[in-house]
């Protein structure tokens, strides 16, 4: 019965957590919707927003209420264990408060002053310096470093660098640094779901990009070679937007809130535009005009009139065009014609959309709205082509622009006459037909003679019988070989030349098209990432919360020890610590590390050096510690010689006694270090000393294995309390680098009987552990050592 009751309570707790999570997601979604509506109101005619001031005030008050209700709990959660959900909600809540107040103030000022440009400048923060440029500084154990943040990827890079340098950073310093990053994320991640194009650089890969390349087929290429071509879609994620410029025409008849007379007027105006477009749309294709001219020339001829050479050429070209089986404007079955219209067509579509919108606004609202893009139309017109593409449009989806750009590339490539003749022989026939018609027209105009009057004078190369005239030199040369033999030779040579030319052209065409396809395939991913609408991904929030919790756990561990442990031994102020240090150091240095233990000790070293951001060794399907460290060092671009040094660090001096580097109470002391790389090496040496000393302690004194853990490795239960486990916890703090927890197995939530030892010296800490585990043995061994040291020689 007790087991069933416990399971029922546990199930109820799980259901309660799920319900609370769902409510938080619902609130976050509503705040995101509110932020999106605020962004729309910023860009709309402020006269419309003025009519919504009362509703906007209610929303601002609701944000105040949510802030008062939720922020205390969110701050408490932040101190316990920050989650991506609570942090994202906290960002959105703070940003919604700022944006709502800003829009309300701008609308109130517009209501009093009525300046459109001032409203847009204030509501959209168009004045002043760029808010997305920030310089941040950080104090490490090896000195001060600074970096500039311009993109979201810069924030991710800084977080990866913090993760790698976590063992040479003080928690208080990082906490202030994380506040600076939080302010930057508040301006970006907190502003809504849509990312401004100037905020991301997709050519910079993120940690997820690198991890994806590590688990996918490499085709013989190295990871670093492939990552250069990687387009990041994790910091920001692109989405497909459906844009239909006819939505207004389709939905207007169903707009019941519009008066019937105004709706009828608007529909009538739209119908007039549609009919006018059908009447004025003409076929401007050059192929159609050429075909009409050719048909007129051929229809003017009859069997009673002699056919000139040019007329015969026109007839033959018409024959080949008709026999090709493809009608004009028939879709071609290749990649090129599967794309959308060209850029000019997109511009025309945008202008048509603006015309329709203006007519409907005038009919329904009796005025044309002064939206942002209309008030600043002159500035938008002066933008260059690249900025206009990034700006996008209201009538064309980003994919339409992308396909138009790609089609323009193909059209430019295929405008070469050679490619046109090979790919589209019927179009080559059209070009030839156009050339013949131009020659006939110019010749007839120059001689002031009608081409089809029957006198046979239009063809210079036609004789009186209507046949081709033979060149005299050609006739003389045929006398030696014979007419038929010479013609056969000319025909064979011409055929051979044509065949060779065609084979060469086909080979050239295949290579050029293959190169173009490869180039466009590679560039298409970048175009899609740049021009499509992007929303914020979860990478930054996940990375920020992981690092924040990792550094916060150091201070929280010390606070929890002071509150929960019944017995605290602080060796930092003990008078007997020096004797204990000398005794334990001398006892351990008599022994050597077993080489068979080095692989496991090396993995422990990797686990302690790795930061909190990459937790592959703590997943449900855990990987070795070197895998997590591999992602940590590769994502910061650690130099190869340092990676090699780190990989072999535990094997150096394993048979000697020079692995001890710290002085008495000098563990994790960096007072003599003046650069970051030297600080890293010193931290590695301290960690190596801790691992070797602990391993020798376990083997010499037979007290069982001592577990060495990071401060962020302790789990937290649903009440926010630590689930304590015995072990030595390294905090990477110079004031209290080592904390030993003992007796956790006998402690409960009601009674805390644990013992905690705080120290800045490895050997005095180990002696205190020996005293706790085997006090009689510790005193006996120490007395024997003192006696032997004072015995006469």
From Swiss-Prot:
GO terms for cellular component: host cell nucleus. GO terms for molecular function: ATP binding; zinc ion binding. It comes from the Viruses. Keywords: ATP-binding, Host nucleus, Late protein, Metal-binding, Nucleotide-binding, Viral genome packaging, Viral release from host cell, Zinc, Zinc-finger. A zinc finger (C3H1-type) spans 206-234. Coiled coil: none annotated. ATP binds at residues 697-704. It holds the Pfam family PRTP. It is found in: Host nucleus. Its main location: host cell. InterPro entries: UL28/UL56 (IPR000501). GO terms for biological process: viral DNA genome packaging. Component of the molecular motor that translocates viral genomic DNA in empty capsid during DNA packaging. Forms a tripartite terminase complex together with TRM2 and TRM3 in the host cytoplasm. Once the complex reaches the host nucleus, it interacts with the capsid portal vertex. This portal forms a ring in which genomic DNA is translocated into the capsid. TRM1 carries an endonuclease activity that plays an important role for the cleavage of concatemeric viral DNA into unit length genomes. Associates with TRM2 and TRM3 to form the tripartite terminase complex. Interacts with portal protein. Belongs to the herpesviridae TRM1 protein family. This is Tripartite terminase subunit 1. It comes from Gallid herpesvirus 2 (strain Chicken/Md5/ATCC VR-987).
């Amino acid at each position: 019965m007790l087991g069933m009751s416990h399971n029922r309570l546990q199930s109820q707790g799980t259901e309660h957590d799920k319900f609370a999570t769902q409510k938080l997601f619902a609130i976050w979604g509503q705040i995101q919707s509110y932020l999106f509506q605020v962004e729309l109101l910023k860009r709309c005619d402020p006269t419309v927003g003025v009519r919504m001031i009362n509703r906007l005030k209610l929303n601002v008050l609701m944000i105040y209420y949510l802030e008062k209700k939720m922020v205390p709990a969110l701050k408490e959660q932040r101190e316990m264990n920050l989650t991506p959900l609570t942090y994202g909600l906290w960002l959105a809540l703070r940003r919604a408060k700022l944006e709502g107040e800003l829009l309300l103030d701008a609308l109130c000022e517009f209501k009093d002053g009525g300046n459109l440009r001032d409203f847009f400048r204030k509501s959209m923060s168009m004045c002043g310096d760029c808010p997305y440029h920030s310089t941040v500084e950080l104090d490490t154990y090896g000195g001060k470093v600074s970096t500039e943040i311009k993109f979201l990827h810069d924030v991710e890079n800084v977080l990866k660098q913090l993760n790698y340098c976590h063992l040479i950073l003080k928690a208080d310093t990082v906490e202030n640094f994380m506040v600076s990053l939080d302010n930057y994320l508040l301006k970006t991640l907190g502003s809504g779901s849509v990312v401004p194009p100037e905020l991301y650089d997709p050519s910079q890969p993120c940690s997820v990009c690198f991890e994806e390349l590590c688990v996918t087929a490499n085709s013989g290429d190295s990871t670093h070679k492939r990552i250069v071509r990687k387009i990041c879609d994790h910091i920001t994620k692109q989405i497909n937007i459906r844009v239909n410029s006819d939505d207004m025409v389709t939905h207007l008849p169903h707009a019941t809130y519009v008066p019937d007379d105004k709706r009828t007027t608007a529909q009538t105006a739209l119908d007039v535009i549609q009919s006018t477009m059908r009447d004025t749309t003409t076929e401007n294709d050059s192929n159609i005009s050429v075909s009409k001219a050719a048909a007129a020339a051929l229809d003017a001829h009859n069997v009673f009139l002699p056919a000139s050479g040019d007329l015969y050429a026109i007839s033959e070209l018409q024959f080949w065009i008709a026999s090709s089986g493809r009608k004009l404007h028939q879709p071609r079955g290749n990649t090129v014609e599967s794309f959308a219209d060209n850029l000019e067509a997109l511009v025309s579509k945008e202008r048509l959309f603006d015309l329709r919108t203006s007519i409907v606004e005038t009919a329904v609202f009796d005025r044309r709205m002064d939206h942002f893009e209309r008030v600043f139309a002159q500035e938008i017109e002066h933008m260059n082509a690249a900025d206009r593409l990034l700006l996008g449009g209201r009538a064309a989806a980003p994919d339409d622009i992308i396909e138009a750009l790609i089609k323009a590339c193909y059209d430019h490539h295929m405008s070469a006459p050679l490619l046109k003749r090979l790919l589209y022989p019927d179009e080559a026939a059209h070009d030839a037909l156009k050339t013949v018609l131009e020659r006939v027209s110019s010749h007839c105009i120059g001689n002031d003679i009608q081409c089809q009057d029957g006198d046979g004078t239009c063809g210079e190369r036609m004789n009186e019988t209507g046949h081709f005239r033979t060149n005299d030199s050609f006739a003389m040369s045929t006398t030696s070989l014979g007419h038929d033999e010479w013609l056969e030779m000319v025909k064979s040579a011409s055929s051979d030349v044509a065949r060779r030319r065609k084979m060469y052209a086909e080979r050239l065409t295949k290579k050029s098209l293959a190169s173009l396809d490869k180039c466009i395939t590679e560039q298409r991913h970048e175009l899609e990432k740049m021009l499509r609408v992007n929303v914020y991904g979860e990478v930054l929030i996940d990375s920020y919360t992981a690092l924040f919790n990792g550094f916060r756990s150091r201070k929280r561990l010390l606070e929890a020890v002071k509150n929960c442990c019944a017995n605290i031994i602080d060796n930092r102020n003990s008078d007997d610590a020096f004797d204990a240090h000398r005794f334990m150091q001398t006892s351990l240095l008599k022994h050597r590390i077993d080489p068979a233990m080095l692989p496991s000790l090396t993995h422990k070293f990797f686990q302690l050096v790795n930061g909190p951001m990459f937790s592959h060794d703590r997943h449900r399907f855990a990987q070795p510690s070197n895998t997590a460290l591999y992602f940590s060092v590769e994502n910061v671009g650690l130099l190869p010689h340092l990676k090699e040094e780190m990989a072999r660090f535990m094997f150096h001096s394993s048979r000697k006694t020079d692995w001890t580097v710290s002085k008495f109470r000098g563990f994790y002391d960096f007072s003599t270090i003046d650069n970051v790389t030297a600080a890293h090496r010193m931290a590695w040496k301290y960690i190596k000393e801790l691992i070797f000393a602990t391993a020798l302690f376990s083997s010499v004194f037979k007290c069982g294995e001592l577990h060495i853990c990071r401060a962020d490795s302790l789990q937290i239960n649903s009440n926010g309390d630590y689930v304590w486990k015995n072990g030595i916890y390294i905090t990477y703090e110079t004031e209290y680098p080592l904390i030993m927890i003992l007796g956790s197995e006998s402690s409960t939530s009601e009674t805390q009987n644990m013992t905690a030892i705080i120290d800045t010296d490895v050997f005095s800490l180990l002696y205190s552990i020996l005293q706790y585990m085997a006090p009689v043995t510790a005193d006996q061994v120490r007395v024997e050592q003192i006696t032997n040291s004072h015995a006469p020689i």
